[in-house]
């Protein structure tokens, strides 16, 4: 599992810069990550997750946002770092960076249950993507681009929405075509 985590960070992060981060963007990231997994990492993930592949589980963390039992996780998808400051645990709003570290620890621990590891892997795949969406890591002054109103082909929108999904939707390709 340690090797899988290293590979995920090594190969997913550079590709994140190329894509948006709506459903399709997250699935693209999961699919790209899968192509770089070792055989052993694939076996470990299949043993842990069953038939689910990384691309299909990459959006789970967004899909559970409407579940009241997961409301506490809403601030895990972003972090705010004011201009001129460095990230410091617990100092600023948003917990994405802290949660990535926490989920890596869960995956490494032998004492973690299978269910804890499944949740950790699903969040880890998703949050790595979120942290590399520029509007999920910002100074907080524009609410992650949500306060910046724009027109997208004549339709009212905001910078966050355009960056998150509309840029990819405009290409009209499935995640497997990237």
Regions found by a protein language model. Give the residues of each.
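Bacterial Sec-dependent N-terminal signal peptides
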Residues: 1-24
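N-terminal, motif-rich segments that launch catalysis or mediate targeting to/interaction with membranes
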Residues: 19-127, 134-178
């Amino acid at each position: 599992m340690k090797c899988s985590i290293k590979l995920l960070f090594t190969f997913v992060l550079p590709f994140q810069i190329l894509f948006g981060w709506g459903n399709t963007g997250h699935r693209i990231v999961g699919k790209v990550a899968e192509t770089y997994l070792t055989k052993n990492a694939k076996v470990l993930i299949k043993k842990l997750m069953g038939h689910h592949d990384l691309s299909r589980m990459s959006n789970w963390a967004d899909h559970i946002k409407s579940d009241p039992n997961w409301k506490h996780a809403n601030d895990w998808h972003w972090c705010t770092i004011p201009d001129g400051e460095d990230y410091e645990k617990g100092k600023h709003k948003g917990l994405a960076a802290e949660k990535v570290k926490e989920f890596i620890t869960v995956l490494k621990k032998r004492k973690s249950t299978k269910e804890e590891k499944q949740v950790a892997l699903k969040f880890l795949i998703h949050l790595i993507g979120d942290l590399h969406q520029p509007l999920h890591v910002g100074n907080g002054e524009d609410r992650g681009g949500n306060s910046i109103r724009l027109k997208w082909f004549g339709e009212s929108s905001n910078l966050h929405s355009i960056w998150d999904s509309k840029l990819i939707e405009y290409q009209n390709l499935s995640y497997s075509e990237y």
